[in-house]
Amino acid sequence: MVGLRTLSVLLITMFMLAPMSGCLDNEDEKPPGFQWPDRAETGCLGEDVNASCEVYLDGFTTPTNSLHHPTKNEVWISDLDGRIVAWDGGQQRLVANISNLISNCHTEAGLLGFSFATDFANASQVLFTYIGKANCETKEVTNLYLASGDVVNGTVAENSVRVLREIEQPYRNHNGGHLLALGDHTYLWGVGDGGGSNDPQGHGQNETSPLGTIQHFHYHNGTIAPLHNTTGTDQDYTLHRGLRNPWKFDVDAQNRLWIADVGQQCFEEVSMVPVLQASNFGWSEREGNREFTDPSDCTKPASEPPAEMTDPVLIYEHENGRCSITGGLFMDWGPEAWQGGYLYGDFCTGEIWRTTEGADGSYDGELLIDTETMLVGFGKGLDGELLLFTWTGTVYSLDTSGV
């Protein structure tokens, strides 16, 4: 008898190999590029898993982020379709809807991230990142935007949204978009390499391009400014580069930045550096801890990176149905057995790991639990629950007290 876990992997593998609605255009990914599966939920946990999983909230297209409100006892959860919903434990309400401003023409487009302004108690502002409106009947490619909006009477007025930065996109995929507030009016913004297979325009190693980077900026009173004033150009926004699609990242109590960077054909990556130590993570000269070639050669031996590049601290291969990393929270909360490492998972298999550091300073991934979901991210619930964001639009809370 085929178990749910086996069936899930088989179905996803079939989806990835066959044409389907929602797959990437050939102009975005060359075969055998990743093919998005249909949104068909298979459940949260398989059999014989010593944990419980409950629906926390549903009705989303694809939930992307959750943040605790700075001044109210509620959590805000963003949706790829352009909405943000607030949850106070008893009532769910719509607090933002910028769907008229965004594009959902591609499976990786939409409202990608948001953050409360670090001085929210005084400014009552929210920052957004999104892909701009496009004509889905054409192959129109629209740009990546960073914007702010005013919160008035608990909701964001669409007419208050102001564009702060615009980054030109050559393709529709690899948009990144995560926003992380560092405090004192400073933020990190993840930007993908612009899409297409194999970084066709070489953005990852182009020092003048904002694509394939993590941007670092100051925002206060409606004004944005770079924090690395070395060239007098937009290059001064770039802190880290050489990334393919830094979908999620987090900072731990030691001010180390943990990045889940989605791989090409062979390896998924977790990178870690001091948050303000400008770094080049090697894409597209390297994938994982190897030189990158087009077409990809997953059998190449590992090699030392050039002196100016930083390899990931942890990689995993595309095997046993694994396909795409999703991060990621550094766990200094939650179940004791899950603390002390960066939490990450795989979109296709639903497996969840935690980074562990060995005595020699190397890092490995400890498999914590095997879910049945198509994971797109993690969050923290109103009462400290570990939330799982899924491709199918459901937010689950995972009780791991028995793990």
Protein language model annotation of sequence segments:
Residues 1-35, 403:
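Secretory targeting signatures
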Residues 28-52, 154-157, 223-231, 293-309:
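Blade/loop signatures of beta-propeller domains
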Residues 30-193, 248, 256-263, 321-359, ...:
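Acidic, Gly/Ser/Thr-rich repeat motifs that build Ca2+-stabilized beta-propeller blades
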Residues 54-55, 92-99, 156-165, 225-233, ...:
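Beta-propeller fold detector
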Residues 132-139, 189-208, 267-271:
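Short, conserved, GDST-rich strand-edge loop motifs in beta-rich repeat architectures
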Residues 147-156, 217-225, 273-281, 355-361, ...:
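Short loop/turn segments immediately following beta-strands, especially the blade-tip
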Residues 235-274:
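Repeat-solenoid scaffold signature
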Residues 362-382:
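Conserved blade-ending motifs and adjacent loop-strand segments that build the rim/top face
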